[in-house]
């Protein structure tokens, strides 16, 4: 997964490529994103847990990335994302609870720049979303998220068997 994030960040075009890591593991995800970014690329980390962000700050500092290349937003993703610039981000990695996936996708998609990619790890629940007998809230939310992404007319969607199922949605 990490090298995939590096590749997606490296493939982004522009002078100041911006990425977002929405995950408790922003230190690890951020390092992979930084590896693919140019020297002017920026990683925005969104996580309500201050402890996770403190760990990421020290990890990035120890790896030699200056504070000017990282932005930390200690908030719930759905509370802060609506205030971010539209069509400004080239990679958004969103590791969120499955129940939040549908709302997160609807909030994140306008932020993706043309050619940018929304990365949704573990979103396919090991293919249980294809089982119509599964009607629990988590499976229904994952199914709704998958159907919504596939309905986006301005998206190329790929599903990969990484983790419990990865969705990549790239904006046309």
What are these regions (language model features)?
Residues 2-172:
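S-adenosylmethionine/decaboxylated-SAM
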């Amino acid at each position: 997964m990490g090298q995939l994030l590096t590749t997606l960040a490296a493939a982004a075009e522009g002078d100041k490529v911006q990425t977002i890591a929405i995950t408790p593991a922003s230190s690890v995800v951020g390092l992979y994103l930084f590896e693919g970014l140019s020297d002017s690329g920026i990683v925005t980390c969104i996580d309500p847990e201050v402890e996770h962000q403190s760990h990421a700050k020290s990890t990035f500092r120890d790896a030699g990335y200056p504070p000017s290349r990282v932005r930390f937003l200690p908030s719930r993703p759905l509370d802060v994302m609506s205030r971010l610039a539209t069509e400004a981000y080239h990679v958004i990695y969103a590791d969120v609870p499955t129940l939040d996936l549908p709302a997160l996708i609807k909030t994140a998609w306008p932020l993706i720049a043309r050619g940018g990619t929304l990365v949704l790890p573990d979103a396919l629940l090991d293919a249980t979303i294809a089982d119509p007998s599964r009607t629990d809230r988590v499976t229904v939310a994952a199914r709704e998220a998958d159907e919504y992404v596939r309905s986006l007319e301005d998206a190329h969607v790929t599903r990969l068997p990484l983790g419990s199922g990865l969705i990549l949605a790239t904006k046309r």
